[in-house]
Amino acid sequence: MRKWLIPCAAVLLCTLVLALCGAAYADEAENITGSCTVKLCSKNFKAAKITDGLYTSYWESDKTTHPWITVSSKDPIYGLYLCFQKMPEHYQVQREKSGGEWETLYEGDTRFHHMYYPIDGYKHLRVYVPDKGKTTMGFNEIFAFGEGEIPDWVQQWKPVPEKTEMLFLATHPDDDILFLGSVIAWYGIEKQRNITVAYLTKSNTTRRSEALNGLWELGIRTYPVFGEFRDVYANPNRISQAYKETGGKDKVQGWVTELYRRLKPEVVVTQDLEGEYGHPQHKMVADAACTAFELAADAGKYPDSLALYGTWEVKKLYIHLYGTPREQVEFDWTVPLDSLGGETPNERAADAYAMHKTQVGQGRKSNGVFTPFSVEEFGVKRYPNNIFGLYATRVGPDIGHDDMLENIEGIEE
């Protein structure tokens, strides 16, 4: 009889493990958006544009009083995920009561353009602007979920901190992933540092959603900062023209100065002074980052941000590809990391870049040959994303050349 005990126990154990695994998978909430009925307050777009999961299409209401959308389902809804194209200053998430009246479940959180709301199994929901006066509301996507665990791709952001250890300043959504993505993953995930990503421009509302999707895929959970500057391509040989067409040198440098004062980073990391492939706005952002290193510490500059946040001395400023080996830190992004699920930082950055749907297929032409943007081609081969130069420091030179937080006091592992 004993000979049968071991195989029987093994079978029972395997059955139990499989049952538990099946239950774990079954616990994930089903995306029931496709079976929902979505109605819009204005008919200028089809509702399918905000339920196709593409983010590249959108619906925006007419400018009207109390814009709204409703989401109805034959099955109970346990989660509503809103990806705004045009977020009003105030909105409410409501459910329809049996008498046809609407009960407010949430006063809308306007800190995040992608926002998830748990719902208690209601079948008829409305997103509604209660304020008087005409306004607009729009969405890139909406999702409804059944009961269960929220899928990993649904974003639940932490707010922008009052104080960050490291600020990664990018020009456009996707620049952060192409050129800074691996170092962001290293410090933000592997090293668990308090990091914040900022963009000079969101470019447009679709690319703002792509930026959020890319950062989330990278593994970052702190909401980024978006500037409101125009996305332009000026004469690549004239930074002055890039400043002018972006909104003016004073405004751009003032915004970066305010960013330093507001977030109080110990270390700032930004793009190449030569603009990687020569993009004038990349050059401009790097120039502004360098100038703001001194401006943010000067009580005589930019009195408005001074009144709000005071002065701030950034300790170290790193520029992509800057300098000689004496000024540079160099990383190895080819080592798999447990914190990244066994991926290398470059592999994780490539995953994140795939979220930038509008940029996949875009690229550069050189000597008659077109090359699409990718982390492998532009972030590794052409403009190595593992090399950064120490442009300015208030804490002395780097000795180890492998850690941007070297010489920064008060930061513990």
How should these model regions be labeled?
Residues A9-A19:
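Bacterial N-terminal signal peptides
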Residues A24-I77, Q85-Y91, R95-W102, E107-G108, ...:
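Disordered, acidic Ser/Thr/Pro-rich linker "stalks" and the adjacent N-terminal cap
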Residues M1-W4:
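Positively charged n-region of N-terminal signal peptides that target proteins for export
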Residues D27, T33-Y58, K158, L295-E413:
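The feature marks non-catalytic terminal segments
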Residues T65-P67, K86-E89, K97-Y302:
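Active-site beta-strand->loop->alpha-helix modules in alpha/beta enzyme cores, enriched
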